[in-house]
Amino acid sequence: MSEQVALNPSEISELIRKKIDQFSVVSEARNEGTIVSLKDGIVRLHGLADVMAGEMIEFPGGVYGLALNLERDSVGAVILGDSSTLAEGQKGKCTGRILEVPVGKGLLGRVVDALGNPIDGKGPIESSGMSPIEKVAPGVITRKSVDQPVQTGLKAIDAMIPVGRGQRELIIGDRQTGKTAIAIDAIINQKGTGVKCVYVAVGQKASSVASIVRKLEEHGALEHTIVVVAGASDSAALQYIAPYSGCTMGEYFMERGEDALIVYDDLTKQAWAYRQISLLLRRPPGREAYPGDIFYLHSRLLERAARINADEVEKLTNGEVKGKTGSLTALPIIETQAGDVSAFVPTNVISITDGQIFLDVDLFNSGVRPAINSGLSVSRVGGAAQTKIMKKLGGGTRLALAQFRELEAFSQFASDLDDATRKQLERGQRITELMKQKQYSPLTVAEMGVSLFVVEKGYLDDVPVNEISSFEASLHDYMRSTHAALLHAINEAGAYDNEIEAKLKKAVEEFKNTGSW
């Protein structure tokens, strides 16, 4: 017969007391929520009480989300990356961090995605640290007025619509009018100037981006450029944040007393991506189904392009950089539909920027490239940044072209024209021809100055319109071979005085006497 074990009540209470004494609680303070719905790259979570707007939310498998909608009993977040590993019922936890991307000189020459991860197969990036993608734009006190030029190397822009360092100049036009070509030429022309460039491709085909990267490499411009890509196959979330990521990478150089140029190609696709996200988050739609804060989407991005004064640079670098101003120049691109610049997003961006370069389909199709409509294009602050030679010689060009366009339309109906009108029309035709320029062939300040000098002083009046491009090319070759010192002097100082005028006059007359074009 088995022996029964009898326990005293006092022993039971002793055992319980021991267990209570030995019991320890290891707690981890975590703000966790549960996924209640997951579709179209948007996740809704219940239980994240302390989440902040714009905070990163971590999901299982290292996937992150961005909290955008904070509602009473749920949080709407957009997933950055692959959502196929997530499922309803899984947990998401707050990280206490906002979205950051790598910054630094190690990114130059690289192609990265919207989160700063390399996608060019050249190995890991040695960054100088991380920086948040959303920042407050420089205040009025910390800014400095724009007074230095960004040379694009395109005669039509540098003479008529000059861009200054720290300016925001919009490039606007229909599809296939050469918007990207202008921006890429501007990046290529910064080679050797010390200006760092960032090219942000939003919603473009991978093949288009690959061909742009190849062109930059061919012209030796990739080494001073960061390419940020959120392609057409990427999620709307990445297309929405890519411009902010690129801006942060460009700001790194501005805050260290250097000059940077950023191209957003294009902000129309970013607006589409943001509209998609907003509608999926069930935000109330407004005009053209865009959310109410679509203006703020672009204004908070473009206001970060600025020129900051030396005191601010010294403060931001903790006294390491003294006496240097920094700048970030923005060239946002907007695509219009059938030339409609009065649509919602184009009018928003026109009102935010400091001027626009308007590209015309009809001009493009008639062979005028770059197809810049000088009547609708304007630069509101760039004039103060122009070099003396460009200001002096290019001043009359814009007016002459505007008058020519007006007269050209009128002359179609008039049978007999007086001599003054005919001369003006002929001069306009010559200026139009002279403003044409091949892609990937930017000119120096001196070369542009020579071209403007010959048209301003009437040296083209006896040159047939169809020979102007060969005349200009031969003149540049002649100047480079026999008057290199003069070109160098103009490039160095950008000055224009009686002495330079006399030298240019002598050189052009010598060239015309050779008749070698």
Curated annotation (Swiss-Prot):
EC number, UniProt record: 7.1.2.2
Keyword check for Translocase: yes
InterPro entries listed in its UniProt record: ATP_synth_asu-like_sf, ATP_synth_asu_C, ATP_synth_asu_C_sf, ATP_synth_F1_a_nt-bd_dom, ATP_synth_F1_asu, ATPase_a/bsu_AS, ATPase_F1/V1/A1_a/bsu_N, ATPase_F1/V1/A1_a/bsu_N_sf
Site, as annotated: Required for activity: 377
Reactions that this protein is recorded to catalyse: ATP + H2O + 4 H(+)(in) = ADP + phosphate + 5 H(+)(out)
Primary location recorded for the protein, binned into one broad class: membrane
Binding site for ATP: 173-180
Membrane topology label: Peripheral membrane protein
UniProt name for this protein: ATP synthase subunit alpha
